[in-house]
Regions:
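Hydrophobic anchor at the beta1->P-loop junction of P-loop NTPases
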Residues: 8
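A glycine- and Lys/Arg-enriched "phosphate-lid" helix/loop adjacent to the NTP-binding pocket
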Residues: 101-169
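ATP-binding Walker
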Residues: 14
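ATP-dependent small-molecule kinase phosphotransfer cores
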Residues: 37-114
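NTP-dependent small-molecule kinase module
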Residues: 140-209
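Walker A/P-loop
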Residues: 17
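P-loop (Walker A) phosphate-binding loop of NTP-binding proteins
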Residues: 11
């Protein structure tokens, strides 16, 4: 791949999606900002069937089945949309990547289903991961504020207990990843976190000139 593949990650409430939106307004050249996890093509088919046939997926299908669809959608989105962009020489900054899916698999699915995430090994190794390190209490407050603003209650995987589990898992995973990961303090105000990320990206881009 001629372009750089970089991704932001952290527990819920760390600000990764907010940072990606702010980066879209930055002046970084030759860069695409997106997510390989949204617009999940195969999951959307399930949601359409649910609406048309009037059933609840949680009553018919397991978490594991939905996760298979999610992994398939991520792989499809990467090969269909993102890898071609990288091959054309553009840099791509993602909101989350494979380490996040593997973490969810380890924490919330039956142990016998951990093998499912091995399908993600077909995806390219990123050039850099940027970990937004945030305190649990700060993350909980941000999630609560978002819920009040949107009217959407937090997902079960966003509970305080789940956040602690996710943070612990990330700290275990990070040293074992086969690519560089930079950790930044995401407890600071949004503008400071944004500037920290922007400085890191400018340094990465400078080394490729």
């Amino acid at each position: 791949m001629r372009g750089k593949l970089i991704f932001l990650f952290g527990i819920d409430g760390s600000g990764k999606s907010t940072m990606l939106e702010m980066l879209k307004n930055s002046k970084l050249k030759n860069t695409i900002y997106t997510s390989c996890m949204k617009n999940a093509i195969f999951e959307e088919e399930l949601y359409k069937a649910e609406a048309i046939l009037h059933f609840s997926r949680s009553e018919v299908f397991s978490h594991e089945f939905k996760h298979v669809l999610h992994i398939g959608s991520v792989i499809y989105n990467m090969y269909d949309k993102i890898i071609p962009v990288l091959n054309n020489g553009k840099n791509v900054i993602l909101d989350r990547y494979t380490i996040c899916i593997k973490q969810f698999t380890d924490l919330f699915l039956k142990p016998s289903y951990n093998c499912l995430s091995k399908a993600l090994d077909c995806l390219p190794t990123p050039d850099l991961g940027i970990y937004l390190d945030v305190e649990i209490e700060t993350a909980v407050k941000r999630i609560e504020q978002r819920s009040i603003k949107t009217g959407i209650p937090p997902h079960y995987s966003e509970s305080k207990k789940a956040l602690i589990m996710k943070q612990t898992t990330y700290e275990t995973q990070i040293p074992n990843e086969a690519y560089p990961i930079v950790k930044i303090d995401a407890n600071k105000c949004i503008d400071e976190v944004y500037l920290s990320i922007l400085n890191i990206l400018n340094e990465v881009y400078a080394t490729t000139l």
